[in-house]
Regions:
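Tandem repeat scaffolds
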Residues: 1-175
Length: 175
């Protein structure tokens, strides 16, 4: 934990029962890696490449993924409270039952993301692209979605209590 692995090439690496808390993985290539169930709390993964990376059930609380590439990554059931995903590319990613309470997802690209039952309580999704995303049964209470793109998104049965849609784009969105 706390190691400096900036720009490391860990393509297809498999991590088992690892504690990577506070590890600096900025710019690292973790595409196709298996990080399922590992501890990455407070890790820094800014500008990292995590294409199709497995993060299922991982602890990502307070981790930073700013500008990271997480396309088609699997974050199902991950704990990512207070994590920073600002400007992250997360299109086609899997976030089923992921806990993103108070996470920052400003300007994140979540196009066609699978986010059923995700917890986004008090999350900041300002200017995020959620077009065609599936947010069925998601908890968005207190979330901020000002200027977010929700075109063709499915928010059926989502908890939208005190959700701030501001100037969100909602063409053909399902509520």
């Amino acid at each position: 934990s706390g190691a400096d692995l900036q720009n490391a090439n860990m393509h297809r690496a498999v991590f088992k029962n690892c504690t990577l808390t506070k590890t600096n993985l900025s710019g690292a290539d973790l595409s196709y890696a298996n990080l399922n169930g590992n501890k990455l709390d407070k890790a820094v993964l800014n500008n990292a490449v995590l294409y199709r990376t497995g993060l299922r059930g991982a602890d990502l609380n307070y981790a930073s993924f700013a500008y990271a590439k997480l396309q088609e990554a699997t974050l199902d059931k991950a704990n990512a409270q207070n994590a920073d995903f600002s400007y992250a590319g997360m299109s086609y990613s899997w976030l089923y039952k992921t806990d993103l309470t108070s996470a920052v997802l400003t300007h994140a690209n979540l196009y066609n993301a699978k986010m059923q039952n995700a917890v986004l309580t008090n999350a900041d999704l300002t200017s995020a692209n959620l077009s065609r995303s599936n947010l069925q049964h998601a908890q968005l209470n207190g979330a901020r979605l000002d200027r977010a793109m929700l075109d063709d998104a499915d928010l059926s049965y989502a908890d939208l209590t005190l959700t701030d849609f501001g100037r969100a784009f909602k063409d053909n969105a399902k509520f």
